[in-house]
């Protein structure tokens, strides 16, 4: 399936139905009076989260969406039927912007599962509504109000617990395929991964976490080099970064420098990303040359106060320890977040006098 994470669509709510001009016509009632009904309300357009979707592909090929208009009013005081709402299903994690003003309308995550983006117009009033003591036969009716319309820009940010960082060919796709059921394309050339991939990792019992693999970063990515930072927004929601450093390619320079380079590009894209905790993972330790220099590299990171984990996604060495460490870190982060939320809730409680 093609991965689409940004689309622009036009939405038009339904117009309200027109009020009816009608007079009561019955035998033996020569002056029955007005009986024109009101028009129906136009339908709204609603964005609704569908947990089964993971891309905006369906919206790529249909740009214009129009809800049903309200039915016109009828005689005998019959009101027109309201137009049906039109639902547009989107994956969780979509940011909804007004395309003309760039205003953020909503973030459709777990806390917000639907959003009315445009509302239908009200139906017009029939002539029965305008009858007065001095005007027994009004011939005035109201047209329906036009429904709202606007251009929207939808941007998808994947929802994941752990994001994988690293240069191209660092082994990110191999890692996610080794610890989950995800099957991204894997090859021995840079930029094999062209779109983000998600994988669900089981860490014992019923506990799981979601890992996101994005295309690798290179120097100048914040300026658009390589694949740029287009896909970095997909790891902005993650709680933890796994920063993979490939030790097998000696031509790429010092591992510490490559580690710092990725962090510089990350900071240029969004300084807030640097506040997220990182676990540094030294990859491809199954290669003999890597074994020889592994201790020296770990010592260099340790001198900077950076703890490292060593793995081989091919042989499986170190993967069990890595998954366990990630699970522990996520548990700590969730516990601290829960504690902060409880503290904030206690501070928001209104003061009450002690009556004891």
From Swiss-Prot:
Q: Name one GO molecular function term.
A: GTP binding
Where does it primarily localize?
Answer: cytoplasm
Segments forming domain Obg: 1-159
Q: Which UniProt keywords apply?
A: Cytoplasm, GTP-binding, Hydrolase, Magnesium, Metal-binding, Nucleotide-binding
What domain of life does the UniProt record list for this protein's source? Bacteria
What's in the GO CC field?
cytoplasm
The positions annotated for binding Mg(2+) are: 173, 193
**Which HAMAP family does the annotation name?**
GTPase_Obg
Query: What's the subunit arrangement here?
Result: Monomer.
Q: What protein name is recorded for this chain?
A: GTPase Obg
Q: Which species does the entry assign this protein to?
A: Syntrophotalea carbinolica (strain DSM 2380 / NBRC 103641 / GraBd1)
The lineage is:
Bacteria, Pseudomonadati, Thermodesulfobacteriota, Desulfuromonadia, Desulfuromonadales
């Amino acid at each position: 399936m093609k991965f689409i994470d940004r689309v622009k669509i036009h939405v038009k709510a339904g117009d309200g139905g027109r009020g009816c001009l009608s007079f009561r016509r019955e035998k033996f009632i020569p002056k029955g009076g007005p009986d024109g009904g009101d028009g129906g309300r136009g339908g709204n357009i609603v964005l609704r989260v569908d947990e089964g979707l993971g891309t905006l592909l369906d919206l790529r090929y249909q740009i214009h969406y129009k809800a049903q208009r309200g039915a016109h009013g009828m005689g005998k005081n019959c009101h027109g039927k309201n137009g049906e709402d039109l639902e547009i299903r989107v994956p969780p994690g979509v940011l909804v912007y007004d395309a003309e003003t760039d205003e953020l309308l909503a973030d459709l995550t777990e806390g917000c599962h639907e959003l009315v983006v445009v509302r239908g117009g009200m139906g017009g009033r029939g002539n029965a509504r305008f009858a007065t003591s001095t005007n027994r036969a009004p011939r005035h009716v109201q047209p329906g109000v036009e429904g709202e319309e606007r251009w929207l820009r939808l941007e998808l940010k994947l929802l994941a617990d752990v994001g994988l960082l690293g240069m191209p060919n660092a082994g990110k796709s191999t890692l996610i395929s080794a610890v989950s059921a995800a099957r991204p394309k894997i090859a021995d050339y840079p930029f094999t991964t062209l779109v983000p991939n998600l994988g669900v990792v089981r860490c014992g019992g019923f506990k799981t976490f979601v890992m996101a693999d994005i295309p690798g970063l290179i120097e100048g990515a914040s300026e658009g080099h390589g694949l740029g930072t287009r896909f970095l927004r997909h790891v902005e929601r993650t709680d933890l970064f796994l920063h993979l450093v490939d030790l097998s390619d000696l031509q790429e320079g010092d591992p510490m420098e490559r580690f710092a380079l990725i962090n510089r590009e990350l900071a240029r894209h969004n300084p807030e990303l640097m506040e997220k905790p990182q676990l540094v993972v030294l990859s491809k330790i199954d290669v003999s040359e890597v074994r020889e220099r592994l201790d020296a590299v770990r010592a260099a990171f340790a001198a900077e106060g950076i703890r490292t984990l060593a793995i081989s996604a091919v042989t499986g060495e170190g993967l069990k320890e890595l998954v366990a460490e990630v699970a522990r870190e996520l548990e700590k982060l969730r516990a601290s977040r829960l504690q902060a939320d409880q503290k904030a809730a206690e501070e928001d409680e209104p003061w009450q006098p002690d009556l004891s």
